[in-house]
Amino acid sequence: MLEPYDGKLSRTVLRREGGGNTADPADYSPLVNRLKGQVIKISPNSTQFINPMDINANYSEEDNPLSLKADFILSLCELVVGGKEGLLPVEKTVIDRCVHLIYRKYFADPCPENMPILEDLYNALLQQDEKEAHHVATALEIYVKGSLNLFNHRTNVNVNNRIVCYDIKELGKQMKKLGMLIVQDQVWGRVTANRSSGKSTRYYMDEMHLLLKEEQTAAYSVEIWKRFRKWGGVPTGLTQNVKDLLSSREVENIFENSDMIIMLNQAAGDRQILAKQLNISPHQLSYVTHSGEGEGLLFFGNVILPFVDRFPTDLELYRIMTTKLGEVSEGAQK
């Protein structure tokens, strides 16, 4: 979910796994609809599409935005093709070559109908002589011609609304990682466009641990996190799966590039790991041990403060945002 905002503060929110408060981007849909924002439902059965190949003139601060776009497409292909070892050097070479080929028409005449789609990359790979190119094309085939072709379309939704929510709830486990990576790139495009207009952009990334769990996407995601901040973006990562977040090699880079961390109630094992990672004293840990709703620790620079946030339950905003099963049912009836 993103919106222009005059402020600059990146945050990481850590929440305990379990309970009725499910961390899912779909939870934001009622709020976004109420605020007249745009909810984009991304699923195999949806008719709303975003094109992973989208690019704009402001995509990079360098003279050639295609180099940065090629880096994203390599990350996408690594997730699809790479396996544990990632892409082979020859595979990276042919992908990069094809990326430059398929964008020639668009940069010669940058109109929407000239924007390439995933199928253009697939076809360009098939035209290369190297067997590695055909291997990559075969891996991409299911995403182009097969049952997972939801990202083989041009963008047909309004991504320029003040508030945009990308709903990926119905994506399967493997497609969700791919979907999150593509959404991240879409948001980057919005950050660059807002920056050229003198606006900041807030970006809330739920289930962030999924992007840090895979080596193929973790390094790119951390680089994007840093770049967001530099370009006037205000990224906020949220997770209930603290173990997976902390197991990532890149988590230290995320913490180092986060101005503020909000920590709610934590499980015993997670508390000890977080205490070591963030230098939390035993007394401070007590504030995230069996703590109540809206209670925890706030980290801002070198300062650690306990907090209590009691959100009024008689407000319309509360009824829209609550994820408690009984209250959601009552809200729907009203």
Segments the model singles out, each with a brief description of its role:
Residues 44-47, 266-268:
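Short, acidic/turn-prone active-site loops that include or flank metal/cofactor-
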Residues 1-4, 11:
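Short, low-complexity S/T/E/D/G/P-rich linear segments that nucleate or cap local secondary structure
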Residues 242-334:
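C-terminal regions of RecA-like/P-loop NTPase motor modules
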Residues 48-54, 270-275:
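Short, charged, surface-exposed secondary-structure boundary motifs
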Residues 239:
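H-loop/switch region of ABC-family ATPase nucleotide-binding domains
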Residues 26, 30-37, 44, 51-233, ...:
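P-loop NTPase motor domains
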